[in-house]
């Protein structure tokens, strides 16, 4: 009889523990759906608050014109605000590399070609190259038109220390060696149409059938309209906007991220900007 009593007691104890575990799991599961429940020892769970329906609102976000993009960018680097070009490039380049890592793992996209232009958009690409190298990718940079400013010389010097090859030219057949191409040629300052050597590079990229990711905007498009004066622009598979997306990307139908997360509260208030909510310490958000 003592043995039977022990077995029944043990069975009840195990059942009670299992019930607590299941109740705890249900608590967290239901909390995810904005319903707060308190696990009890009763048959059912006792509701503590009203539940709310999962109506997902469309993300509110400001799309910047070319003029406003330039104005905000200049203000960010003014003495009044305090950013430097180097700081903004580092923040942008890091978020670019983190988004690339999220979407294109190095086990599948081992070798990356980053095509950089002579301006700040190209500088973002040079920074991203360094981080992607640390993330385990085999990175090569195409930099056909070198910027002579000290900042860009220092970025190139860093690439040497990370053993990243920098090319000055490229043949169409060379693109077969890469799994992913990053378009960091032209940013929001671009006007007109692509000129040599970038017109040929854009054509080669579009003809390569490789996965292409554009930084800020697909190179060659009009920042405000999203069109191209001569139909020569990067046909990218994904775009990573910086600061805020540009007006020309309102109808962008492919995967679209926002990276950077560096607009101060004062600028947001001054220009009445609608900035999406970033998750905790995440420097990017999918649009």
Swiss-Prot record:
Q: Which reaction does it catalyse?
A: (6R)-NADHX = (6S)-NADHX; (6R)-NADPHX = (6S)-NADPHX
Entry's EC annotation: 5.1.99.6
Question: InterPro entries this protein is in?
Answer: YjeF_N_dom, YjeF_N_dom_sf, YJEFN_prot_NAXE-like
Cofactor(s) in the UniProt record: K(+)
Q: A Pfam family in this protein?
A: YjeF_N
Q: How is the cofactor bound?
A: Binds 1 potassium ion per subunit.
UniProt keyword Transcription regulation, yes or no:
no
Q: Which PANTHER family match?
A: NAD(P)H-HYDRATE EPIMERASE
Protein's job:
Catalyzes the epimerization of the S- and R-forms of NAD(P)HX, a damaged form of NAD(P)H that is a result of enzymatic or heat-dependent hydration. This is a prerequisite for the S-specific NAD(P)H-hydrate dehydratase to allow the repair of both epimers of NAD(P)HX.
Q: Which HAMAP family match?
A: NADHX_epimerase
- This chain belongs to the protein called NAD(P)H-hydrate epimerase
Species per Swiss-Prot/TrEMBL record: Plasmodium falciparum (isolate 3D7)
Q: What is the lineage of its organism?
A: Eukaryota, Sar, Alveolata, Apicomplexa, Aconoidasida
């Amino acid at each position: 009889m003592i043995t039977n009593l022990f077995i029944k007691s043990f069975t009840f104890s195990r059942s009670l523990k299992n019930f607590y575990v299941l109740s705890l799991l249900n608590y967290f599961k239901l909390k995810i759906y904005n319903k707060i429940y308190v696990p009890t020892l009763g048959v059912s769970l006792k509701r503590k608050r009203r539940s709310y329906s999962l109506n997902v609102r469309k993300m509110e976000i400001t799309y910047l014109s070319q003029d406003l993009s330039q104005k905000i960018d200049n203000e960010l680097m003014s003495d009044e605000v305090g950013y430097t070009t180097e700081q903004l490039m580092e923040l942008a380049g890091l978020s670019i590399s983190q988004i690339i890592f999220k979407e294109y793992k190095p086990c599948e996209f081992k070798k990356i070609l980053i095509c950089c232009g002579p301006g700040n958009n190209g500088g973002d690409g040079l920074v991203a190259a360094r981080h992607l190298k640390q993330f385990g990718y085999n990175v090569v940079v195409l930099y056909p038109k070198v910027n002579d400013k000290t900042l860009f010389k220092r970025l190139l010097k860093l690439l040497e220390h990370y053993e990243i090859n920098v090319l000055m030219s490229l043949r169409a057949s060379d693109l077969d060696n890469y799994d992913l191409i990053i378009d960091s040629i032209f940013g929001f300052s671009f006007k007109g149409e692509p000129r040599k050597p970038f017109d040929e590079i854009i054509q080669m990229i579009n003809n390569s059938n490789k996965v292409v990711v554009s930084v800020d905007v697909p190179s060659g498009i009009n920042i405000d309209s999203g069109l191209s004066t001569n139909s020569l622009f990067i046909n990218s598979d994904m775009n990573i906007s910086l600061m805020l997306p540009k007006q020309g990307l309102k109808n962008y139908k492919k995967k679209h991220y926002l990276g950077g997360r560096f607009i101060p509260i004062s600028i947001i208030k001054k220009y009445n900007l609608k900035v999406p909510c970033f998750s905790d310490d995440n420097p990017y958000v999918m649009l």
